[in-house]
């Protein structure tokens, strides 16, 4: 077994790379888990530095692999809780840390991040398996109590979508939903050759800082509106909301809302609903707006105006 090496530069860097390669060749990477071990100690140092850890922090790491990032985290915080789905990786990490001074400061949870109950943590740091990027992000943002910050490695395009602004080509439902709940900062690009094995795409690291307290909004309602608006983001809202299936769904929601509120007007036609929708869009200057150009405040205003007329999205 190769003992963990304290990350440094020059000869120490090469020694660490050799250790990583040795661990990599002990077993085959599992493609279904999206396993790509981060091997460059300089990138690891930068990620830990940008995490702004405190000595009292509990850090959640997702997909620690053989522990290259884990070891550096353990040097800078009180405790690391590592969630690993691959038993081989978990065993390798356990062996590696057992030979270090940090054995009592690591907790390994064997399981699928998307299925396990998350413990308390202050900071999340992860080289994210790219195929679970979106559900992972929103599971983190839904976690309570709210954590301080997350520094996450994603596929480059996904990272750019997270931070995209109105008018950007990558601006989408993901951008709007993430930025409703958090501040997103792009930290650095990471080339594919910094991993074993190299992924097919470039990567990037972002910082996500959840708003605390979170916005007082029903997220299911919000996402229902945003999902509809971005179904064709370059089409006008007038065009999107005139689609017969959309009108039919919103009319059914409206009737349910009226029934629950004890209101009598539960027999309105789809044509009446269409008129109500168009009036709401027109009165609030949204008729010719396009989702690709609307910011968070625009969507908040639009949702509030729809709610004022009894139009709901769930």
UniProtKB/Swiss-Prot annotation:
Gene encoding the protein: dimt1
GO cellular component: nucleolus; nucleoplasm; small-subunit processome
Protein's UniProt name: Probable dimethyladenosine transferase
Keyword RNA-binding: yes
Subunit structure: Part of the small subunit (SSU) processome, composed of more than 70 proteins and the RNA chaperone small nucleolar RNA (snoRNA) U3.
UniProt source species: Dictyostelium discoideum
Annotated catalysed reactions: adenosine(1779)/adenosine(1780) in 18S rRNA + 4 S-adenosyl-L-methionine = N(6)-dimethyladenosine(1779)/N(6)-dimethyladenosine(1780) in 18S rRNA + 4 S-adenosyl-L-homocysteine + 4 H(+)
Database matches in PROSITE patterns: RRNA_A_DIMETH (PS01131), SAM_RNA_A_N6_MT (PS51689)
Keyword match Lipid biosynthesis: no
């Amino acid at each position: 077994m190769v003992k963990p090496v304290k990350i440094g530069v020059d000869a120490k860097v090469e020694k660490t790379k050799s250790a990583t390669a040795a661990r990599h060749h002990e077993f085959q990477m599992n493609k279904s888990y999206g396993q790509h071990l981060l091997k460059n100690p300089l990138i690891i140092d930068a990620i830990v530095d940008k995490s702004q850890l405190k000595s009292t922090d509990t850090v959640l790491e997702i997909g620690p692999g053989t522990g290259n990032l884990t070891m550096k985290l353990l040097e800078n915080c009180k405790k690391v809780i590592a969630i690993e789905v691959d038993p081989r990786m978990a065993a390798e990490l356990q062996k590696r840390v057992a030979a270090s001074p940090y054995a009592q400061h690591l907790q390994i949870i064997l399981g699928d991040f998307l299925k396990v109950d998350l413990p308390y943590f202050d900071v999340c740091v992860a080289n994210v398996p790219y195929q679970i990027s979106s559900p992972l992000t929103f599971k983190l943002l839904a976690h309570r109590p709210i954590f301080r910050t997350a520094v996450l490695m994603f596929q480059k395009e996904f990272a750019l979508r997270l931070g995209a602004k109105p008018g950007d080509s990558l601006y989408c439902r993901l951008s709007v939903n993430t930025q409703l709940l958090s501040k997103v900062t792009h930290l650095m690009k990471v080339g594919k050759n910094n991993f074993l094995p190299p992924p097919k795409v470039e990567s990037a690291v972002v910082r996500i800082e959840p708003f605390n307290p979170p916005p007082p909004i029903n997220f299911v309602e919000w996402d229902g509106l945003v999902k509809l608006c971005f179904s064709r983001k370059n089409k006008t809202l007038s065009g999107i909301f005139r689609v017969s299936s959309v009108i039919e769904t919103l009319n059914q929601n409206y009737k349910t809302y009226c029934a629950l509120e004890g209101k009598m007007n539960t027999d309105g036609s789809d044509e009446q609903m269409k008129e109500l929708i168009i009036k709401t869009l027109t009165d609030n200057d949204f008729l010719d707006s396009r989702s690709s150009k609307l910011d968070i405040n625009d969507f908040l205003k639009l949702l509030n105006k729809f709610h004022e007329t009894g139009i709901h999205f769930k």
